Amino acid sequence: MSRIGKQPIPVPEKVAVELDGLSLTVKGPKGELSRTLPEGVSISQVDNSIVVSAINSKRKSRERHGLSRSLVANMVEGVSKGYSKKLEIVGVGSRAQVKGKNLIVSAGYSHPVEVIPPDGITFVVENNTNVTVSGIDKELVGNEAAKIRAIRPPEPYKGKGIKYAGERIIRKAGKSGKK
């Protein structure tokens, strides 16, 4: 039995949960998320909590037990609190701005790069170098932040590029000149 999977998921008062077999819909103050859980698990609602359990003790079922519990917990937290990832743009002339809903990043290329957000994702830019990606779906927020970082990943010599807030870039020494 999964140590993560056997923990019940507390459901806040503001969050409504609808179960239909392996389909789950979670509604909260920030929005609504739906997901179909993988085969091999069962889900039930007990009082103000959700319990995910493995149907049998086969390997596939045990593997998906903890995964399913984490997915449901992320959905409940997403519709009640939301998720956000912060990115920092480092480098001379590198900056970002929001135009409508789209994010426009100038990262040292000959042209600005435009990032179009999927539904449920918002971009906020503070003082041209700090970008916050926020939404209710943890997976979607992480993927969008990774796409923005991939525009210009931080390089190890000067540390220029787009990095996550708090990310430590391991620096390399440059060439040691001829002596």
From Swiss-Prot:
InterPro entries: Ribosomal_uL6-like, Ribosomal_uL6-like_a/b-dom_sf, Ribosomal_uL6_a/b-dom, Ribosomal_uL6_bac-type, Ribosomal_uL6_CS. GO terms for cellular component: cytosolic large ribosomal subunit. GO terms for molecular function: rRNA binding; structural constituent of ribosome. Keywords: Ribonucleoprotein, Ribosomal protein, RNA-binding, rRNA-binding. The keyword rRNA-binding applies. Pfam families: Ribosomal_L6 (PF00347). It comes from the Bacteria. PROSITE patterns: RIBOSOMAL_L6_1 (PS00525). GO terms for biological process: cytoplasmic translation. Belongs to the universal ribosomal protein uL6 family. Part of the 50S ribosomal subunit. This protein binds to the 23S rRNA, and is important in its secondary structure. It is located near the subunit interface in the base of the L7/L12 stalk, and near the tRNA binding site of the peptidyltransferase center. This is Large ribosomal subunit protein uL6. It comes from Prochlorococcus marinus (strain MIT 9211). The gene is rplF.
